[in-house]
Amino acid sequence: GDVYKKQLYNIVDSIYVSRLGTDALTAVSLAYPLQNAILSAAVGIGVGISSAISIHLGAGNREKADRAATLGIALTLIHCIFFIIAGLTISEPFLKLFTDNPKILNDASIYTEIVLCLSFGSLFQIAFEKIFQGIGEMKITMYLLIAGCVVNIILDPILIFGLLGFPALGVAGAAIATVIGQISALLLYIIVYRRNSYAVHISFKHLVFDKAIIRQIYSVGIPSTVMMLLPSILISVLNSILTAFSDVYVAVLGVYFKLQTFIYMPANGIVQGMRPIIGYNYGAGESSRVKSTIRYSLLTAAGLMLTGTILALALPKQILALFDADAALMSAGVTALR
């Protein structure tokens, strides 16, 4: 859900930003790898937190489940500090590797710095989402995912184009709308958590340095993070190649990857959703349920991927029209989607 939401944020940003011109769309595309790095770390470690919680709950050890949730929040704070420092130090030098166009560089730098320096909303929101998933509260995560997306969709045109008396902030407005959507979802998670009683409790009394649980979180989280980072590395390499030809190709690549990931994300969501179920049943020794969950999840994911492939092949022009594509963007984009 968190990954799907992030891709929806990116696509909505790109649809509105494309109205500002190809340079603005290129700027958001160049910012994507760094933005995805935040997501990769948050989701990867979040998966580790969720896995640890579900395993300990399945084994009937509530105390360790509480400790895993609390340590997960503490580790998220450390990651948040790291990304703020990164946003202030490496974002502009990184972006200079891919463009010397001053307008594109300025817009990309502003967008990236806002998203990285205010990344606490995304990081903590995803941590809470994974904690809720770890205890099986899938409906709540879905509702709050939708709430954050709605806030972003409403604010994007207002802040980008300056509606309802707000100043027109352009690309910066897209970034601000994104982080406000993330922070809104985080605040809703905190409110829901504090007003209800759940299977795990986050508290300072559970904040104990437990090497085994930390190792458990990172042993699952780091491989997941690395796997999710690979597309960012690929996109960065391709951006460096394509900028030698035309900034339009960078914009096309950005649109293509966001659409590709958006199509892929429902299948990924199925896989993410099966993890706490598998973890709980594995901890309870229910091997037959583990096998049936894996089988059903993989079949459903394959069906979703097939549907996405058919849409991309059949309706590429209609999809690209959402991004206000000019002739050059449309021509290259249709080829990329197909």
Residue ranges of model-derived segments:
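Short, small-residue-biased leader/transition segments that mark boundaries at the very start
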Residues: 3-4
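Interhelical loop/hinge segments that connect adjacent transmembrane helices in multipass membrane
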Residues: 175-178, 190-231
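Alpha-helical transmembrane segments of multi-pass membrane proteins
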Residues: 102-128, 259-261, 267, 327-338
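Residue-level recognition of transmembrane alpha-helices
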Residues: 29-32, 76, 112-115, 119, ...
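Small-residue-rich hydrophobic transmembrane alpha-helices
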Residues: 25-85, 122-141, 239, 252-316
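Helix-terminus/linker motif at the lipid-water interface of multi-pass membrane proteins
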Residues: 8-26, 95-102, 158-169, 229-262, ...
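Short membrane-interface helical motifs at transmembrane helix boundaries
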Residues: 82-113, 307-334
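Membrane-interface helix-loop junctions in multi-pass transport and translocation proteins
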Residues: 139, 150-187, 316, 322, ...
